[in-house]
Swiss-Prot record:
Predominant subcellular localization, coarse grouping: membrane
Source species, domain of life: Bacteria
Protein family per UniProt: Belongs to the inorganic carbon transporter (TC 9.A.2) DabA family.
Essential cofactor(s): Zn(2+)
Binding site for Zn(2+): 460, 462, 719, 734
Cell location: Cell inner membrane
One GO molecular-function entry: zinc ion binding
The protein's name: Probable inorganic carbon transporter subunit DabA
Organism: Thiobacillus denitrificans (strain ATCC 25259 / T1)
UniProt keywords, alphabetically: Cell inner membrane, Cell membrane, Membrane, Metal-binding, Transport, Zinc
Keyword Membrane set for record: yes
Keyword Ribonucleoprotein annotated: no
Gene Ontology annotations for the cellular component aspect, listed alphabetically: plasma membrane
Length: 1043
């Protein structure tokens, strides 16, 4: 049976829409920070958090005890918290005799354990009786109520196996997940495993089907996969068949698909990203998408259901399950209690025996006794919780006087309040931070400089740049700027001796320009030796047998790596560098190739391929070929002449042999006109036109307000990290560069900005760069705090005399930054900076970067809290504790607001992703984060699992956001502050739909500080509210809405 095309397309559309709540997961080597609830950003923040709890079984707010700890530490605005409670109470019915505001504020601040969900069996009359010390009123619970409770765990779309696990303890879900994970590991492996799934080029579903049909282990278990796969040879057809066999109504297919995909949302997110990443090498070789993945999951799930039905008599479809529950609700209820972990401990043994006996009469006798006991316990516990709360609020007597109807209203009200309390705490903590930051911004016009600075330094907006910028500025004549770390130049980079492109830009952008790295000098012998040794190392380290075969293969060198990088990383690194010297000096190819140059390159490549083909196919060595023979073969393969007569005659090839060889040149070696056109098109992507070069330099300078007063040195500082034995290393690199180092983008812009032709064009546009200004690329290692200059051999001779001063200043800032930062990493502050030894702290930072045993080489972007867009003068006098993204911006250089819109649409969106990833990883590290690094194992060279088999861990590890099991990262939504006239900033925000929606839906906080009016404007409750700039923290209640 083959499904009709229209039906197949409908199923594909359903699957892709069902997968939209699942965030993309990029390979670990280019880790991209992302919002775990990115697919729900169209919803208000609170609604998305609630849906995330249902889909991913994860919490979206910190527990109350942690919030109370923040309150005790003075990190919560108590006034705002009380106002949140008052607003909630204004919409609630009154409860006679109770001061609800005081009661609920006491619940928040003085009761550590939440009251939890209301009782399921005990009602208000039962609780009232306990409060009065009376016996519970006699009451029989109807079977319909029990069936309803069971039905609440069986919503439409929930997979049948999940219901069976709950009612019968089958653990089908865990078994299914294990089989699916193993299948994914086999198919998606990128060279880690010794064995890869055969036939992967056919795609995930076809390759897996071929293996599954022959899988003896599955057949012996009774999983007759082959019978299911025989129904249809397409994944869409199999999906339709399985859903029909399960009896799932078509209206519920979407919810069912979403439940299936979110079960292992890490794997689903990786497949979802991979299927759309057309440039990704492994996607092109071995295609896969969510339809393939879902079909495999449904096939295995149906096979497991049938296996359990045959062996244990469990229902095999939804209709059978419904009949089972309806025919014996008592058994269904007790099964749910026992297998769902709700059973009363004192009656657990009796319930287990009754379920195992499978005799309706026995469960019917046990049920009334169980229900009565549970009703009594629920009533007593709830009464005790209410009494404890009321007494702490000074309302114990008032609680005793409540009638049953009042108790019912109070219970429902408390449940609604606890559902919303996370939002209230978050708003109060965010108000506290906003109240600390906004009034401290300096809006005074800056004094004109007496002289130009010694150096101007552009850093990435990354929060880790804030510390080193501050220390560099304190040293003296340095002016710093913040700009997105790709410097506004999206490039696709082909590094030295690399064969693939790396996108160095935010993932929301797609680069169209390719940059090549070329070596200046090279020693052929050294290159051959080093590349061979490096290949040996790569193969050995990649092998699962490496701990055993390395000593036999190349002595103790690899073993020394393990010990040296753990016990003496600095000394060992210096010794190791003598074996692995730095790569040769390089230049970047930035100018467009002419058509003649491109065609010449293609001709050279074709000639080289022809020589290779002749040697491989015909066994003819190069020295026997003349240039004319090679030309003949090339022209024949391209169809420019009929045959290569001279070549055929020289080597005595008959007509068939000659024709066959020429066809091989076309088909195997791709020497044909069509492929030549494709190569010409690809070569056309290399470099930038002069107009593009002028545009990128001008845009970068205008976006940060640097259009005049250029100093002798302008440093473009990209950043990245270095750490050993760290799968999350790319998470510490530059997010604006796609999880890569930013030095290449810095070199690109510096090389362009130093061109005379580019400067001449910029001068026509009003940007006059001084004749003695030189742009120098630099690299900020965020793990060691080192600042390193690049391409110094290009410096004009006139600048050489100043380089020592420049390097010394950068080194001093690095040491001071390390002294500050290392205190946050050590258990005791004195460990990092004993006796003010900043050099010692710097050495410790370098040691951490080289230590294989170091699980936290740096904190990364933890504790990020705000994104400030404005002049450095507004924040220059503040110690922002490495918590703020700083993007330089001068509205006076941007009369139409286009530059501000670009900052909002690009860098701010990336910052919001970073912020949300840290937020959710800190709030619930077990589900949104990735747990402890200690238990991580690499999966297929592209991801991380916990233990040997798990879902792909998609968030940040505990060591990045937690310290001593408590959040080190304070989870706050990103506070975005724009320093500009309010109308100017508001127009820009409204002009960027993505940011406007994030603001309206509460995914970030937005504020504008107007330097002309000295007012602050904060977007709250769907509108802008005006505050005096220097009194934001005191103006919570005195709000003026701006229409």
């Amino acid at each position: 049976m083959t499904l009709a095309l229209g039906r197949r397309l409908k199923i594909r559309a359903l699957v892709h829409v069902a997968g939209e709540p699942i965030p993309y997961f990029w390979p670990m080597r280019t880790f991209i920070h992302h919002n775990p609830l990115y697919g729900l950003e169209h919803l208000p923040f609170e609604q998305a958090v609630a849906m995330g709890e249902r889909l991913f079984r994860a919490h979206g707010f910190l527990p109350r005890a942690r919030q109370q700890a923040y309150l005790a530490a003075g990190r919560v605005d108590a006034t705002v918290l009380a106002a949140q409670v008052a607003r909630f109470c204004a919409d609630q019915p009154e409860v006679a005799g109770l001061d609800l505001e005081r009661l609920l504020l006491t619940l928040l601040t003085d009761v550590e354990t939440p009251l939890g969900a209301p009782p399921t069996l005990a009602d208000a009359a039962d609780v009232h009786a306990v409060l009065r010390g009376a016996a519970l009123p006699a009451r029989e619970i109807p079977s319909g109520a029990l069936a309803a409770q069971v039905g609440s765990d069986m919503p439409p779309g929930r997979p049948l196996y999940a219901m069976l696990d709950l009612l019968f303890g089958t653990e089908i879900g865990a078994t299914l997940d294990e089989l699916v994970i193993k299948s994914c590991l086999d198919f998606f492996d990128e060279g880690q495993s010794v064995w890869q799934m055969p036939g992967r080029e056919q795609g995930l579903f076809r390759a897996w089907s071929a293996v599954a049909r022959r899988n003896l282990r599955l057949f012996i278990r009774g999983l007759h996969i082959k019978r299911i796969l025989a129904v249809d040879d397409t994944p869409e057809g199999i999906i339709s068949h399985v859903m029909g066999e399960l009896g799932v109504p078509e209206d519920d297919w979407m919810n069912h698909f979403t439940c299936e995909l979110t079960r292992l949302h890490g794997w689903a997110g990786f497949i979802r990203w991979r299927s759309g990443a057309k440039h990704y090498h492994w996607t092109r070789r071995y295609p896969a998408d969510l339809v393939d993945y879902l079909a495999i999951r449904l096939v295995l799930g149906l096979a497991l259901l049938r296996e359990h039905a045959a062996r244990a008599g469990t229902p095999a479809n939804l209709a059978e399950l419904a009949r089972r529950v309806e025919s014996n609700p008592a058994e269904a209820y007790l099964c749910r209690e026992f297998h769902g972990g709700r059973v009363l401990p004192e009656m657990a043994h009796a319930v287990e025996d009754a379920i195992a006996a499978r005799r309706p009469a026995r469960t019917a006798r046990l049920l009334p006794r169980y229900l009565e006991r549970k009703r009594e316990i629920e009533a007593r516990r709830h009464a005790q919780s209410l009494t404890r709360l009321a007494e702490r609020a000074g309302m114990g007597a008032a609680l005793q006087r409540l009638a049953p109807d009042d108790l019912a209203r109070l219970t429902a009200l408390l449940a609604r309040f606890e559902d919303e309390e996370g939002r209230m705490w978050l708003a109060a903590r965010e108000a506290h931070y906003m109240g600390r930051l906004l009034p401290c911004l300096d809006l005074a016009p800056p004094a004109p400089p007496e002289k130009r600075p010694f150096a101007q330094v552009m850093f990435c907006i990354d929060v880790r740049s804030e510390r080193i910028r501050r220390h560099l500025e304190k040293l003296g004549s340095y002016q710093t700027f913040g700009i997105a770390g790709f410097f506004g130049v999206p490039v696709s980079f082909i590094g030295l001796e690399k064969g693939s492109e790396t996108h160095l830009c935010p993932v929301v952008a797609t680069p169209k320009n390719v940059v090549l790295e070329l070596a200046i000098t090279r020693n052929a012998d050294d290159e051959a030796f080093v590349s061979t040794l490096e290949q040996v190392f790569h193969e050995l380290k990649a092998s699962v047998l490496s701990p055993f075969i390395t000593v036999e293969a190349i002595g103790l060198l690899f073993g020394l790596d393990m010990f040296g990088k753990s016990l003496a990383p600095l000394a060992y690194s210096r010794w190791r560098e003598r074996l692995h010297p730095d790569k040769p000096d390089t230049r970047l190819l930035l100018d467009k190739l002419s058509r003649e140059q491109a065609e010449s390159i293609i001709r050279s490549l074709q000639r080289a391929l022809i020589v290779k083909a002749v040697r491989r196919e015909l066994g003819i060595p190069r020295e026997l070929l003349t240039d004319e023979m090679i030309r003949e073969l090339r022209e024949t393969a391209l169809g420019n002449q009929a045959q290569a007569a001279g070549f055929a005659q020289r080597f005595e090839l008959d007509c068939d042999a000659e024709t066959g060889f020429v066809e091989r040149l076309r088909q195997v070696y791709r020497i044909d006109r069509g492929y030549a056109r494709l190569q010409l098109e690809r070569l056309g992507r290399i470099g930038f036109t002069l107009d593009e070069q002028v545009h990128f330099v001008g845009q970068a300078l205008r976006s940060i307000g640097l259009v005049s007063g250029f100093s002798r040195f302008v440093l473009l500082t990209g950043h990245g990290s270095t750490s050993e034995n760290n799968p999350y290393e790319s998470a510490l690199d530059c997010g604006a560069c796609g999880g890569n180092h930013g030095i290449t983008n810095a070199r690109v812009l510096a090389q362009i900005a130093n061109k005379t032709a580019v400067r001449a064009r910029l001068r026509e546009q009003g940007i006059v760069i001084a004749d003695d200004t030189w742009f120098v690329p630099a690299f900020h290692n965020t793990t060691t705090d080192e600042l390193r200059l690049y391409d110094l051999d290009l410096l004009p001779p006139s600048h050489l005399v100043y380089t020592e001063r420049l390097i010394n200043g950068l080194q001093a800032a690095s040491h001071l930054c390390a002294a500050e930062r290392m205190r946050t990493l050590q258990d005791t502050p004195g460990d990092a900076d004993e006796n003010g030894d900043s050099a010692g702290a710097y050495r410790l930072a370098r040691r951490n970067a080289l230590d294989w045993s170091q699980v936290r080489p740096e904190w990364g972007l933890a504790r990020n809290a705000a994104f400030v867009i404005g002049r450095r003068d507004a924040t220059g006098g503040l110690d922002l504790e490495g918590r703020v993204f700083l993007h330089s911006y001068d509205y006076r250089c941007d009369p139409r607001g286009r530059l501000l819109e670009n900052i909002l649409a690009g860098p701010l969106v990336v910052g919001q992703w970073i912020n949300m990833e840290h937020y959710f990883s800190a709030v619930d590290n077990a589900h949104y984060g990735s747990g402890s690094k200690v238990y991580h194992n690499i999966a297929g060279r592209f991801g991380v699992m916990t233990g040997n088999l798990s879902d792909l861990r998609t968030g940040l590890p505990a060591q990045t956001v937690l310290k001593d099991s408590a959040p080190y990262h304070e989870p706050l939504r990103l506070l975005t502050v724009i320093e500009a006239p309010f109308a100017h900033a508001r127009a820009a925000v409204e002009g960027v739909v993505k940011v406007k929606n994030l603001m309206h839906n509460g995914w970030l906080r937005m504020a504008v500080v107007d330097p002309e009016t000295r007012f602050a404007y904060v977007f709250e409750d769907g509108g802008w509210r005006q505050y005096p700039h220097d009194a934001v923290s005191e103006a919570v209640e005195e709000k003026e809405t701006v229409l």
